[in-house]
Amino acid sequence: MSGRGKGGKARAKAKSRSSRAGLQFPVGRVHRFLRKGNYAERVGAGAPVYLAAVMEYLAAEILELAGNAARDNKKTRINPRHLQLAIRNDEELNKLLSGVTIAQGGVLPNIQAVLLPKKTAKAAK
């Protein structure tokens, strides 16, 4: 006795909206946050999928650049300094996150041109 009545079909295995969209970020959780956040009275079915995809893309982009920064510094672990270097050296990410302060991120190395030693004719020879 399965409780499905006469000739009822077995229910298909549940598949998350994240896996249907081919995403790692949780679509269901994003949908819940959109509903609970009082952003709008109603939330469409596609909105959380799109938002989760955008957030996943941005996270992947930042982690890729931060991983490169860590490798350049001969480190195997990404730390806040690597995130800072990755974001500030990328023009578009820097513009997007211009108002963001990363704790323990430090600053970009920069020396004003007027402070550098002057090149003389003797030094050139």
Curated annotation (Swiss-Prot):
The nucleosome is a histone octamer containing two molecules each of H2A, H2B, H3 and H4 assembled in one H3-H4 heterotetramer and two H2A-H2B heterodimers. The octamer wraps approximately 147 bp of DNA. Residues 1-21 are annotated as: Disordered. It comes from the Eukaryota. The modification N-acetylserine is found at S2. Core component of nucleosome. Nucleosomes wrap and compact DNA into chromatin, limiting DNA accessibility to the cellular machineries which require DNA as a template. Histones thereby play a central role in transcription regulation, DNA repair, DNA replication and chromosomal stability. DNA accessibility is regulated via a complex set of post-translational modifications of histones, also called histone code, and nucleosome remodeling. The keyword tRNA processing does not apply. Disulfide bonds: none annotated. One of its GO terms (cellular component) is nucleosome. The modification Phosphoserine is found at S2. InterPro entries: Histone-fold, Histone_H2A, Histone_H2A/H2B/H3, Histone_H2A_C, Histone_H2A_CS. Its main location: nucleus. Keywords: Acetylation, Chromosome, DNA-binding, Methylation, Nucleosome core, Nucleus, Phosphoprotein. GO terms for molecular function: DNA binding; protein heterodimerization activity; structural constituent of chromatin. It holds the Pfam family Histone_H2A_C. PANTHER family: HISTONE H2A. Belongs to the histone H2A family. Residues 1-18 have a biased composition (Basic residues). It is found in: Nucleus; Chromosome. The keyword Nucleus applies. Coiled coil: none annotated. The modification N5-methylglutamine is found at Q104. SMART domains: H2A (SM00414). The lineage of its organism: Eukaryota, Metazoa, Echinodermata, Eleutherozoa, Asterozoa. This is Histone H2A.
